[in-house]
Amino acid sequence: VASLVGSEMCIRDRCMPGGKIAVYTGMLEVTKNTNGLAAVMGHEIAHAVAKHSVERASRGAILNTGTQLLDIFTGGKLSQVNRATGMDTIGLLSQLGIMNPFTRKQESEADYLGMIFSSLSGYDIRETTKIWERMKEFNKGKSQPEFLSTHPSADNRIKKINEWTNKIILEYPPIKIS
């Protein structure tokens, strides 16, 4: 199920648990055309097909268990301040060292699979690079270092997408329906 959500101020799209997809109308400024919109939709469909939200929830539960084990191993003897500091530190290190790299990997996987889905559907996947160039321009001066982000940087995305484009066009041509 896909929905177009009315918010010109929000340049965003997302796949929610259960595979529901939302594209905010502000994203249409970046996609510019049907090939661009197909790239965005393909990316979000890839998140649903690959069950990325389930993977993230599972990984989060495992990390939460790890922080609870710390509490058990210390016998609950840490002061509230030390306990909170320890939990916050573990949470931050887990986010930066485990969750962020994991979700960046999922984003790259969704980029790749989304390009395949779009190509099979007959859309021009060369538009994907143009979307990321526009996103890079839109976010100029607002982006954070990649290691702090759940998403690859625009530069890394553009590089990977350019590496994949010709291969995908050759290996996954549009499906002919007769």
Language-model regions, residue ranges each:
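Catalytic Zn2+-binding segment of zinc metalloproteases
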Residues: 34-36, 45-61, 74-77
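Membrane-active amphipathic alpha-helices enriched in small hydrophobic residues
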Residues: 58-77, 86-98
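Short helix/loop segments within enzyme catalytic domains
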Residues: 84-148, 174-177
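Catalytic and substrate-binding regions of cell-wall glycan-acting enzymes that process beta-1,4-linked
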Residues: 141-164
